[in-house]
Regions:
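Conserved hydrophobic/aromatic pocket- or pore-lining residues that grip, position, or stack substrates
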Residues: 22, 56, 66, 84, ...
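A fold-wide structural signal in alpha/beta-hydrolase
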Residues: 82, 106-116
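Active-site-proximal cap/loop segments of hydrolase catalytic domains
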Residues: 114-246
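Serine-hydrolase catalytic-loop signature spanning alpha/beta hydrolases and amidase-signature enzymes
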Residues: 88-92, 112
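Non-catalytic accessory segments flanking enzyme active sites
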Residues: 1-78, 92, 97-103, 107-108, ...
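Glycine-rich His-Gly loop
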Residues: 14, 85-89, 167-170
Length: 246
């Protein structure tokens, strides 16, 4: 609040099932008032949907959070179609916000999940530090661990599992496609960062030098060798891949 001694706190709230809303909380009267809520057309009723937080064990023992949302009745004890989203870079948090475009998928029985992999800051600064530079591969192993956990829990199966990532999340999709193509039916990499080595070796590209802090400087052999282990473009091989949209 801009007024320090105000008795009213104004805040916003959203979740995977709750459209963004602005609230005023009266600290003296202990009352809550909705000031504004984003309109959702089509008769949306959030009581028809459920959201959960799960945790998947990573290979090194870290517990990776997963946010999921689905329409009630979608989990019937048999694997469902599931779309798994991931990013995991720059310390950015993949917030479980309300996304209107997901309603159509949920209404058709699709489960939507966000893998809060290392490289983001969902669990604090250390979560970011453990997903960059020489620890970047944690981002990919975390995502694979989340996918495996969702399959093990019976929420989905490899023939019904799709994955999506954008930009640096597209790097995640490309790396995971090379590492575990058998785990997914389809993968979407939107504006993906897939040619890591050549991009980071070209200082004429505006963002290259400042991004050494995120990926490392491939002009140094240790970084070059490590980046080569996951750069999607450099690890494509003769194997059966999921259906890909790039």
């Amino acid at each position: 609040n801009k007024v320090y001694d105000s008795e009213v706190v104004r805040f916003t709230y959203t979740s995977l099932i709750s459209p963004k809303a602005v609230y005023d909380y009266d600290m003296a009267g202990r009352s809550l008032e909705v000031k504004k809520e984003s309109e959702v057309l089509g008769g949306y009723d959030k009581t028809q949907y459920t959201t959960e937080r799960l945790f998947a064990p990573a290979p090194d023992g870290a517990m990776v959070p997963i946010s999921i949302v689905y329409k009630k009745g979608a989990r019937k004890g048999t694997p469902s179609p599931l779309l798994l989203y991931g990013y995991g870079a720059y310390g950015l948090t993949s917030e479980p916000n309300f996304e209107m475009e997901l309603i159509s998928l949920l209404d058709r029985g699709v489960i939507y999940a966000i893998a809060h992999v290392r490289g983001g800051s969902e669990m604090g600064r250390y979560w970011y530090e453990e997903g960059r530079l020489f620890d970047k591969r944690n981002t990919f192993s975390d995502f694979i661990a989340c996918a495996e956990y969702l399959v093990e829990q019976g929420l989905t199966s490899p023939d019904k599992l799709a994955a999506e990532g954008v930009s640096a999340g597209g790097l995640l999709i490309g790396a995971v496609a090379n590492m575990r193509p058998d785990l997914f039916k389809a993968m979407v990499g939107a504006v993906p960062f897939v040619d890591v080595i050549n991009t980071m070796l070209d200082p004429s590209i505006p963002l290259t030098v400042i991004e050494y802090e995120e990926w490392g400087n491939p002009n140094e052999k240790d970084y070059f060798d490590y980046m080569m282990t996951y750069s999607p473009y450099d690890n494509v091989k003769a194997q059966e891949y999921p259906n890909m949209l790039v």
